[in-house]
Amino acid sequence: MFDLKSVSFVVPGEPQGKGRARIGKVGNFARMYTPAKTVAYEGLVALAAQDVMQGRDLIEGPVMIELRIVHGVPQSKSKKWKAEALAGLQPCTKKPDADNVLKAVCDALNGVVYKDDVQVTDGSFKRRWGDTPGVHVRIVPLCQ
């Protein structure tokens, strides 16, 4: 029997999106690499997930992922705007795009929570303003 308990954790700090692969030239050869900022953020996500996965096996079946992406309120905004943002009255349209945050999180969880992100069959996300930026992640194993 496999474990059907969900996995929940928080990735602290301002959310980061998955950066595009870059091309660098080494001699006469082109080389593709992932930007250092993306590698660092994926490492932070994996570390947060490892803390809650201690002693658990990797999820092998399909999963659903839920993200609550919380961006810090910009200091440059007025007190009124900040209050509205924290009350949910100002839409959160700050970069990075939610789909890029989702890609970064899904890729970082390969081999940590599940075997491969191809197992992610369902998902949802919400973007909000908040006092404490971070990404709240919940992985739910689905019955097969």
Residue ranges of predicted features:
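Acidic, proline/glycine-enriched N-terminal capping motif
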Residues: 1-144
